[in-house]
């Protein structure tokens, strides 16, 4: 079973819906633009998120974008202790994969990484915070997916 390591999110006004949760990569990237009142007091990430962030600087040839992505990776490494993708997460991935397949969608490519993050949340028994809730719609009833909005109520489109 995974141990939940996390950061404390400062509270501005009201208490969040959850005490803890797992942030997907979109939340980590946009963390400074999100309404922190909607985030749990303890927020953790999956090692899969670190893998996505580590690949980011290598996925562009634009030097300024490489630097921005490297900064995001370094901030995430300094801020979060990542939950490992362990045997419990691997077993949970089977359930996630089955739910996505039953919904008629494929679990391939970049989407597969999102589903590995969802499996980490399922194994940890924590809700998954994302900017792309539509990417996880087949997981209703399996993993609680929480939309992380900007202070202006904006979500990202499906990526």
Enumerate the language-model features and the residues they cover:
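Anion (oxyanion) recognition and catalysis
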Residues: 122
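PIN-domain endoribonuclease scaffold, especially VapC-family toxins
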Residues: 4-21, 31-119, 137-156
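Flexible glycine-rich beta->alpha loop in the catalytic core of nucleotide-sugar glycosyltransferases
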Residues: 134
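Conserved catalytic-loop position in the HRD/HxD motif
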Residues: 24
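Conserved acidic donor-binding loop of glycosyltransferase catalytic domains
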Residues: 131
């Amino acid at each position: 079973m995974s141990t939940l390591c996390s950061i404390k999110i400062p509270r501005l006004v009201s208490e969040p819906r959850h005490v803890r949760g797992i942030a997907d990569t979109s939340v980590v990237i946009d963390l400074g633009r999100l309404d922190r009142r909607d985030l749990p007091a303890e927020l953790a990430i999956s090692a899969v998120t670190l893998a996505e962030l580590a690949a980011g600087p290598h996925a562009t040839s634009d030097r300024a974008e490489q630097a921005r992505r490297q900064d995001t990776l370094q901030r995430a490494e300094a801020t979060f202790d990542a939950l490992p993708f362990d045997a419990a997460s691997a077993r949970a991935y089977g359930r996630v994969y089955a739910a996505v397949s039953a919904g008629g969608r494929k679990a391939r490519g970049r989407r597969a990484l999102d589903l590995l993050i969802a499996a980490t949340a399922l194994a940890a028994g924590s809700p998954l915070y994302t900017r792309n809730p539509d990417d996880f719609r087949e997981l209703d009833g399996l993993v609680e997916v929480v939309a992380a909005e900007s202070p202006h109520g904006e979500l990202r489109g499906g990526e």
